[in-house]
Amino acid sequence: MARVGGGKRHLKRLAAPAFWPIHRKEAVWAVKPRPGPHPIEESIPLLILVRDVLGYAETSREARKLIAEGRIKVDGRVRKDYKFPVGAMDVIEIVGADEYYRMIPYPVKYLVPMRIDAEEAKKKICRIENKVTVKGGHVQLNLHDGRNVLIRVEDPRNPVEAQEYKTLGGLLITVPEQEILDYVPFEEGVIAIVKSGRNVGRVGRIEEIVKGMGRKKTLVKMRDVHDEVFYTVAEYVFPIGKEEPLIKLPEGAWK
């Protein structure tokens, strides 16, 4: 997906990401997401999500009022900024309506809210972008949505507590507490969803990883539920389960 410029405070509708469900010629300007957990080209501002995607408001004024009143939670926390960027795997709660959604990569539409129940809304799967050693010798996992998870180690010279967690692996956590529930390595045999590119939203089992120089040069061979083989790059692969997906998926995406 083409990158949207980040230097200006305003965003013209014609320059907005193609998957935003807004009328391009109805007005000149669109809400520009603030810098946050997801890049502009992979996210949607909270106002557009509430008004144009979920349909909880008819106008910008109504959507901003709902958000300002604390009626919308993202990953278990109230978000009152109508420019807050919402992206892949984020959990949305409509406070008082007992309605929950997970933002899922989806073919053509790129990113859609999928209805989930209250129990499912307590967990979120994230991708490990990198891991670093911090003060005290502990290990910090930096995730795709901007959050950090600290793995405390007893012996910094031999951090066995953090050894299993690798870059590009999937980490199932509770939200908002960030308690680790499960881990899915980026390796052959696991189930993954494609988060971007022409195969966005496709789910399959990883059959082969052909290493290259960097994520965008590493080719991944996958096989979907219809026994069709497709290829993408490691940068777009998001592990979500070993034998079965750890989260609910759209009907027909997997078994």
Swiss-Prot record:
Residue span(s) of domain S4 RNA-binding: 44-107
GO terms for cellular component: cytosolic small ribosomal subunit
Hydrolase recorded as keyword: no
This protein's record includes keyword rRNA-binding: yes
PANTHER family: 30S/40S RIBOSOMAL PROTEIN S4, SMALL RIBOSOMAL SUBUNIT PROTEIN ES4
Protein family according to the UniProt entry: Belongs to the eukaryotic ribosomal protein eS4 family.
Protein name, UniProt field: Small ribosomal subunit protein eS4
Species: Ignicoccus hospitalis (strain KIN4/I / DSM 18386 / JCM 14125)
Lineage: Archaea, Thermoproteota, Thermoprotei, Desulfurococcales, Desulfurococcaceae
